[in-house]
């Protein structure tokens, strides 16, 4: 696994100059993913010197995890920079020479084809037959036409019909089925193929949304997610390079790895502190006056804080918010955590000695003909493999070798995570043989897969607006505590960042980065006069 070097302490680092420490607010950042690192970097750059980062795992990066797999760098987590101009991740990568030169043709990545730059997606049935390219294109046009309609409910304020149950999946399935069924030019066999392809497209869409099913995704809110124009870029050296750039000026003493947090105590009064005289303050130094917040770690260590920036994933907050915060979160914030959605999207990488696919093939899409009329794409445990929607060919082979990347989401992804490598490799090989009709496909040389759902410090891949939730819930999740600006309650004791707290860019790396910068800027604004005064004195 690639590791990130944190800069060693030196006389010119942000902690050794600038504002005098004894005036500094104590800031604890929980989590060293993109949001936490962006918040920390922004705080240090703006003169804050008493910043501590607590990361539960043994590495930085969060849901960015680049793995060296032979000569190839594979992404278990974040893969693409979505869009160009206006995307801070893109500009960071471009300014630091992380992106390769690409042609216009190479940059035209389709919405459904997840990985490849060139070539053709092969839609294969479970009978081992390839669906003709013209039929695939015909269906794709129909699906994309309906997809555009799903955006209009939010963007144009279009009312949602009760029959859709405010569900992207139900709306899409019903309308596409209706259009297919009423088409007078198609034979019954063609209609069945298209209906089967619809189910496959919905599986892919679920992987992209990180939802167990598109039936769970809110139709009225779907169009609020904002796409930045431009291509989807892959970083050849690994997305971890972005993590390293964010972390390179963070001194090593700021960052504590392997430091899971047990509880965040906020609105901590002087009376509370009287009984805690034996609790040591392990921040870099102590600011005069009581600390309104205290962070209690699993190993028994405590950190006093004026401000705590929480970047835990929505999955972790769903699992632990009732015990993680003392006092408990306000009811409306807890309700927003409950209403918003997060599921698991996992990747399965298979390495082969030689390609069994043709040179123009950029992906193998699994179309189950017996699923044409299913209303639900949830499966019993023994059929978890049916949720694998496709295998994409990693491109170019000079970089990746002969590598396929499979996609699976929802509860079936969690079931996959529980299986051993041998079982998953065998099942994937059988699927590839079945759908290509080639019984001579060998087992892969090696397998690598993600396990975001069962990772106790992540618990899912990324968030979505579930039926019953809205952008307002994202705003409530992001709102700092305490809510009231009372003179008796110190402000901004607990701040919230992470992709799930960005109303327009949830589920993205740029949303995560921007959310961290947003919370840092709240503190910069709060201490504007102090920072200016101390900078003038320096």
Regions found by a protein language model. Give the residues of each.
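FAD-dinucleotide binding site
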Residues: 1-538
């Amino acid at each position: 696994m690639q590791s990130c070097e944190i800069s060693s302490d030196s006389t010119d680092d942000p902690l050794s100059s600038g504002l005098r420490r004894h005036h500094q607010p104590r800031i604890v950042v929980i989590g060293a993913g993109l949001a936490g690192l962006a918040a920390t970097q922004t705080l240090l750059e703006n003169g804050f010197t008493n910043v501590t980062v607590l990361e539960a795992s043994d590495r930085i990066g969060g849901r960015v995890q680049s793995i060296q797999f032979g000569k190839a760098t594979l992404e278990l987590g974040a893969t693409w920079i979505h869009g160009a101009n206006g995307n801070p991740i893109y500009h960071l990568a471009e300014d630091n020479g992380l992106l390769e030169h690409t042609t216009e043709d190479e940059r035209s990545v389709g919405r459904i084809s997840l990985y490849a730059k060139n070539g053709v997606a092969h839609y294969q049935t479970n009978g081992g037959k390839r669906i003709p390219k013209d039929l695939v294109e015909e269906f794709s046009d129909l699906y994309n036409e309906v997809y555009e309609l799903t955006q209009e409910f939010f963007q144009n304020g279009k009312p949602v019909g009760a029959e859709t149950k405010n569900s992207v999946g139900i709306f899409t399935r019903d309308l596409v089925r209706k259009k297919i069924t009423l088409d007078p030019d198609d034979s019954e066999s063609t209609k069945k193929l298209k209906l089967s392809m619809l189910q496959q497209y919905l599986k892919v869409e679920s992987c992209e949304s990180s939802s167990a099913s598109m039936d769970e995704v809110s139709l009225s809110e779907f169009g609020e997610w904002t796409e930045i124009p431009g291509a989807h870029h892959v970083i050849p050296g690994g997305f971890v390079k972005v993590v390293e750039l964010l972390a390179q000026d963070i001194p090593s003493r700021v960052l504590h790895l392997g430091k899971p947090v047990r509880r965040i105590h906020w609105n901590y009064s002087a009376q509370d502190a009287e009984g805690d005289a034996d609790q040591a303050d392990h921040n870099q130094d102590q600011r005069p006056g009581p600390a309104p917040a205290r962070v209690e770690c699993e190993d028994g260590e405590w950190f006093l804080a004026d401000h705590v920036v929480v970047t835990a994933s929505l999955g972790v907050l769903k699992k632990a918010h009732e015990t993680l915060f003392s006092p408990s979160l306000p009811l409306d914030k807890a309700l927003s955590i409950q209403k918003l959605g997060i599921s698991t999207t996992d990747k399965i990488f298979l390495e082969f000695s030689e390609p069994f696919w043709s040179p123009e093939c950029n992906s193998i899409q699994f179309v189950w003909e017996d699923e044409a009329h299913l209303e639900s794409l949830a499966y019993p445990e023994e059929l978890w493999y049916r949720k694998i929607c496709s295998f994409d060919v990693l491109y170019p082979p000079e970089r990746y070798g002969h590598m396929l990347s499979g996609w699976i989401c929802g509860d079936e992804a969690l079931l996959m995570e529980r299986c051993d490598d041998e079982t998953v490799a065998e099942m994937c090989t059988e699927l590839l043989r079945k759908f290509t009709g080639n019984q001579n496909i060998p087992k892969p040389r090696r397998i690598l897969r993600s396990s975001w759902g069962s990772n106790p410090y992540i618990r899912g891949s990324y968030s979505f607006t579930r039926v019953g939730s809205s952008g307002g819930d994202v705003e409530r999740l992001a709102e700092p505590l305490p809510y009231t600006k009372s003179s008796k309650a110190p402000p901004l004791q607990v701040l919230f960042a992470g992709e799930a707290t960005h109303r327009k860019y949830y589920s993205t790396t740029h949303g995560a980065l921007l959310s961290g910068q947003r919370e840092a800027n709240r503190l910069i604004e709060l201490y504007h006069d102090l920072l200016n005064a101390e900078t003038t004195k320096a």
